[in-house]
Amino acid sequence: MIVVKIGGRVVKNSLDKVILDIANINDKVILVHGGGDIVTDYTKRLGIEPVFVTSPEGIRSRYTTKEELEVYIMAMSLINKMITSKLCSLGKNAIGITGADGGLLLAERKKRIIVIDERGKKRIIEGGYTGKVKEVRSEVINHLMKLFDIIVVSPLALDVEESTPLNIDGDQAAFAISKAVKVNVLVILSDVEGVLVEGKVVDRLTPEEAKELSKKIGPGMNRKLLMAAESVENGVNKVIIGSGVKDRPVSSALELNGTVIVNG
């Protein structure tokens, strides 16, 4: 079993390549998708101005109000069903769900977050409807995998305490699921060839090397490296960070094109 995570830019620019490639893979697949650019498009169409915040670490992320959460759910559900229907039309036995369905991903809403304001100062604001995954109900995945070959998962989670779905980071969802079911391989696809140092792709990293390198590279990729290291240390065989915009993107990554994080 493998997990594949595709980022929002891959969803927008290279989705058909990914779907066709996954349809030709002879393995069980959990596909976790993003779609931030599409969420932004729909938000603006509905007359809602999207808000983004920057953390002290320099990571820019969507600030999800209750109103925008509704748009987020709508857009992610659309992406999910588009992917699932295309896979089914290619003869694959696929199902599309969100992380909130069946309580697959249980999360806690961030009550407050620290952001950098327009003056460059730290400020504490209400957390909105963004969450952090606290638990993965792996039995949901295990049961569905007895019935389906491919599970397409939207990055939503369930806040049991407040009985509401939450926007969660797609990478976080993919890493959490991978650790919980201890998959053979987690493939992270974005619009770059892998982890770049001085313009060149780093071919291979141990978890320890990944953690060390995370201190020296930019926001976004540094989080991927930290989560990759933790995943490998917790039972995932290997994590591969590669390009989602080339031909056969998943197969190419499985052929170890990109950055491979693995023990030893």
UniProtKB/Swiss-Prot annotation:
One of its GO terms (biological process) is arginine biosynthetic process via ornithine. Its EC number is 2.7.2.17, 2.7.2.19. It catalyses: [amino-group carrier protein]-C-terminal-N-(1,4-dicarboxybutan-1-yl)-L-glutamine + ATP = [amino-group carrier protein]-C-terminal-N-(1-carboxy-5-phosphooxy-5-oxopentan-1-yl)-L-glutamine + ADP; [amino-group carrier protein]-C-terminal-gamma-(L-glutamyl)-L-glutamate + ATP = [amino-group carrier protein]-C-terminal-gamma-(5-phospho-L-glutamyl)-L-glutamate + ADP. Pathway: Amino-acid biosynthesis; L-lysine biosynthesis via AAA pathway; L-lysine from L-alpha-aminoadipate (Thermus route): step 2/5; Amino-acid biosynthesis; L-arginine biosynthesis. The keyword Cytoplasm applies. Pfam families: AA_kinase. The record marks 5, 224 as: Transition state stabilizer. One of its GO terms (molecular function) is N2-acetyl-L-aminoadipate kinase activity. The keyword Ubl conjugation does not apply. GO terms for cellular component: cytoplasm. It is found in: Cytoplasm. InterPro entries: AceGlu_kinase-like_sf, AcgluKinase_fam, Asp/Glu/Uridylate_kinase, LysZ. Substrate binds at residues 35-36, 62, 167. Keywords: Amino-acid biosynthesis, Arginine biosynthesis, ATP-binding, Cytoplasm, Kinase, Lysine biosynthesis, Nucleotide-binding, Transferase. It comes from the Archaea. Involved in both the arginine and lysine biosynthetic pathways. Phosphorylates the LysW-bound precursors glutamate (for arginine biosynthesis), respectively alpha-aminoadipate (for lysine biosynthesis). HAMAP family: LysZ. Belongs to the acetylglutamate kinase family. LysZ subfamily. This is [LysW]-aminoadipate/[LysW]-glutamate kinase. It comes from Saccharolobus islandicus (strain Y.N.15.51 / Yellowstone #2) (Sulfolobus islandicus). The lineage of its organism: Archaea, Thermoproteota, Thermoprotei, Sulfolobales, Sulfolobaceae.
